[in-house]
Amino acid sequence: MTKVLFLCTANSARSLMAEAIFRQFAGDDFEVASAGTEPTKPEPGALAALEHLGVETDGLHSKALADIDLNSFDYVISLCDRARTECQALCGDQHFIAWDFPDPVTSKKADAFKKTAHELSERIKMLLLILRKKSDRPQLFDAPHEFFKIMADPLRLKMILMLQHHGELCVCQF
């Protein structure tokens, strides 16, 4: 079973919401947890935003990263720059993914928690789609060379030339 861990600093809003949303959408197909580098109690606004989305909040509580074995997770997803900086080096063979979401706790906007919960739910839906497809075809794009193997020669050559010229490419630039 694939195991996913969501991280942020306090484990009181973003990562806690991500854990609950992922659990609801994934069902029994995945195991999910969340933790914080400096955990505090769950934010009432986060719990209210989850309930607004119809996501179950029973049993949600903040957990310390120190109490979790990072090596037991297949995917570790940080939800803030600080957690990414502190935790990326600690991750061994797992896939480390960095999602930077603004902290709704420090936001002045009235709907910050609802907006964050909605954005997390959309991102998690996409992640689950990818993870489920990958489990159907586990060898699909595990490494860049696998991706290049399926390209036609002219496209492969064009991509290599673009990489050489630009050094780094992002789809948002095209």
Predicted regions and their residues:
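Conserved active-site segments centered on acidic
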Residues: M1-A66
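Short glycine-rich anion-binding loops that position phosphate/pyrophosphate groups of nucleotides
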Residues: S12, D81-R84
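Conserved acidic
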Residues: E38, K109-A112, T116, A143, ...
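Alpha-helix C-terminal capping/helix-to-coil transition sites in glycosyltransferase folds
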Residues: L70-S72
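Redox-cofactor binding/interface segments in oxidoreductases and associated redox assembly factors
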Residues: S78
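Long, low-complexity, charged/polar intrinsically disordered regions in eukaryotic proteins
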Residues: D136-L140
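N-terminal helix-turn-helix DNA-binding core of bacterial DNA-binding proteins
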Residues: D142-F174
